[in-house]
């Protein structure tokens, strides 16, 4: 096909996909009866066609893009100016849609209002709102009776799975993207006019290449495993807690010794959960900070409004120095902090132990504050030997007499994530960067700044979830996805299929 030009609608030439006739009728899903369009607005595309958009990753960020695109196409379906729909595809490494499956702890709740779902802030009338999900599943009144804005985490993941199921025809699951490379230079313009996305089917190893004018990289963060921790099956990142620990420690009544490293929400949740999951186990929470610190979630502008979509504009327009100062000042809203009610529960548990055993060394559950794990070894019994180093701060240690040794059957690292996975996937794109000394710099609309002398204006790459330094603390959070998804749709496809506002 001819992939060198675009239609007036911003879609590639070639086989046209007419806007489907809208027709609603009942459809049964794996969870419960629902209503869905019998003819998707976004039909499947064969691998050998030039795509208008390929999204690398199909987590919440890419799902929000799919929803925003669907909603806008629905609004323009009867417009005489829209005669074709974009050709898009999502490539996802996981076997199905999943959101933090390793941290779906029993009883855990969301930390943001359900109103900040994948659609409501952008369009409360969208069929993809959390409230519509509840209505479809006949739970709207039941949820209302809970009197809360914070759904159970397991329910919110089910909501997102329900949304994702509407786009199943567009997603290639169990597909790992290997790299994104520039196309051959167009002989007429002398510029790159599309990109090649190379991926591998995990089950068979089959490698497939697809071509796209626009590529969104939204692969989320990689577990951060500090260098001092060796590769060991008994050392688990918090992201795999629920999916890995039960098989590793399969006797819930055994007197295990389990350590957790970290001082944020995940560390506190796991420490608290272990005491119920393994009632006879000894648990230890090890952290560099001197205490668990409460998150600041006041509704006033200085705190919660930091995560409002419009704050992204304000943050982006600041100088680099101002941005860095802002991030450091407001770190307590998102990093190494714990919701106050969980801190209170943990403190109450510690206090009961103090009543029973004045000697803290006799406690079943302990918190080792102002400590770091300096070394990890394993013995013949396969237990981990942890060397703890007490410290005044993160970098200044006390004398050796304050060091301790600890044995553990498992160590869970709640050490956060690194968000640089895009760099390896886009390694071949680096020579095309507009300002190589600035690294992977993106514009306000998340478009990677590429050299206009080398890359056609109608081709581009967008980065998601790795732009905190330029777009603020909300960049990796759910709070702004509804609006951001529409911004990406607008940036790629233009005003004719914008956010509809």
Curated annotation (Swiss-Prot):
Compositionally biased, Polar residues: which spans?
26-37
> Which residues hold NADP(+)?
263-266, 334-336
Chain sites annotated for binding FAD: 92-100, 111, 177, 476-478
* Ranges annotated as biased composition (Low complexity): 1-16
- Mind listing the GO biological process terms from this record? biosynthetic process; intracellular iron ion homeostasis
Which InterPro entries has this protein been placed in? FAD/NAD-bd_sf (IPR036188), Lys/Orn_oxygenase (IPR025700)
Keywords (A to Z) from UniProt? FAD, Flavoprotein, Monooxygenase, NADP, Oxidoreductase
Where along this sequence does the record place binding of substrate? 116, 304-307, 334, 479
Q: How is the cofactor bound?
A: Binds 1 FAD per subunit.
Highest rank taxon of the organism: Eukaryota
Pathway given for this chain reads:
Siderophore biosynthesis
- Required co-factor? FAD
What induces or represses its expression, per the UniProt entry?
Answer: Expression is under the control of the iron acquisition regulator hapX.
The entry assigns this protein to a family as follows:
Belongs to the lysine N(6)-hydroxylase/L-ornithine N(5)-oxygenase family.
**Binding partners and assembly:** Homotetramer.
Q: What job does the chain carry out?
A: L-ornithine N(5)-monooxygenase; part of the siderophore biosynthetic pathway. Arthroderma benhamiae produces 2 types of extracellular siderophores, ferrichrome C and ferricrocin. The biosynthesis of these siderophores depends on the hydroxylation of ornithine to N(5)-hydroxyornithine, catalyzed by the monooxygenase sidA. The structure of ferricrocin differs from ferrichrome C only by a serine for alanine substitution and the assembly of both siderophores is suggested to be performed by the nonribosomal peptide synthase (NRPS) sidC.
According to UniProt, the name of this protein is L-ornithine N(5)-monooxygenase
Gene name, Swiss-Prot/TrEMBL: sidA
């Amino acid at each position: 096909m001819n992939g060198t030009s675009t239609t007036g609608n911003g879609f590639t030439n070639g086989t046209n996909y007419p806007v489907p006739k809208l027709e609603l009728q009942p459809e049964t899903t794996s969870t419960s009866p629902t209503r869905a369009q019998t003819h998707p607005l976004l039909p499947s595309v064969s691998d050998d066609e030039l795509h208008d958009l390929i999204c690398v990753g199909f987590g919440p960020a890419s799902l929000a893009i799919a929803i925003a695109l669907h909603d806008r196409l629905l609004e323009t379906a009867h417009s005489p100016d829209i005669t074709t729909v974009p050709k898009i595809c999502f490539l996802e490494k996981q076997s199905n849609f999943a959101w933090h499956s390793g941290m779906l702890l029993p009883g855990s709740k969301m930390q943001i209002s359900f109103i900040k779902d994948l659609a409501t802030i952008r369009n409360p009338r969208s069929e993809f709102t959390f409230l519509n999900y509840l209505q479809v599943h006949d739970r709207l009144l039941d949820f209302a009776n809970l009197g809360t804005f914070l759904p159970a985490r397991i329910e919110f993941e089910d909501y997102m799975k329900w949304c994702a199921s509407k786009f199943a025809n567009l997603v290639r699951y169990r597909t790992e993207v290997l790299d994104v490379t520039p196309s051959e230079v167009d002989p007429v313009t002398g510029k790159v006019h599309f990109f090649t996305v190379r991926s591998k089917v995990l089950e068979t190893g089959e490698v497939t290449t697809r071509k796209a004018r626009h590529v969104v990289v939204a692969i989320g963060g990689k577990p951060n495993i500090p260098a001092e921790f060796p590769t060991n099956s008994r050392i688990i990142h918090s992201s795999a807690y629920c999916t890995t620990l039960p098989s590793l420690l399969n006797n819930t009544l055994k007197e295990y010794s389990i350590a957790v490293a970290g001082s944020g929400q995940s560390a506190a949740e796991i420490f608290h959960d272990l005491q119920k999951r393994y009632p006879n186990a000894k648990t230890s929470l090890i952290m560099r900070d001197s205490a668990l610190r409460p998150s600041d979630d006041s509704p006033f502008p200085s705190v919660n409004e930091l995560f409002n979509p419009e704050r992204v504009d304000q943050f982006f327009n600041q100088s680099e120095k101002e941005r860095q100062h802002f991030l450091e000042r407001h770190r307590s809203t998102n990093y190494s902090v714990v919701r106050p009610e969980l801190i209170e529960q943990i403190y109450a548990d510690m206090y009961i132990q103090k009543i029973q055993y004045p000697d803290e060394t006799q406690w079943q559950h302990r918190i080792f504050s102002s400590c770091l794990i300096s070394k990890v070894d394993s013995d013949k019994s396969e237990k981990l030997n942890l060397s703890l180093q007490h410290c005044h701060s993160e970098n200044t240690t006390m004398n050796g007499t304050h060091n301790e040794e600890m044995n553990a059957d498992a160590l869970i690292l709640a050490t956060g994530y690194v968000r640089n996975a895009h760099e390896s996937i886009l390694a071949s794109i680096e020579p095309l960067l507009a300002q190589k000394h600035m690294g992977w710099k993106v514009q306000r609309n998340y478009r990677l700044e590429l050299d206009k002398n080398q890359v056609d204006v109608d081709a581009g790459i967008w980065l998601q979830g790795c732009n905190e330094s330029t777009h603020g603390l909300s960049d990796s959070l759910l709070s702004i996805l509804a609006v951001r998804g529409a911004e990406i749709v607008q940036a790629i496809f233009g005003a004719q299929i914008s956010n509809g506002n």
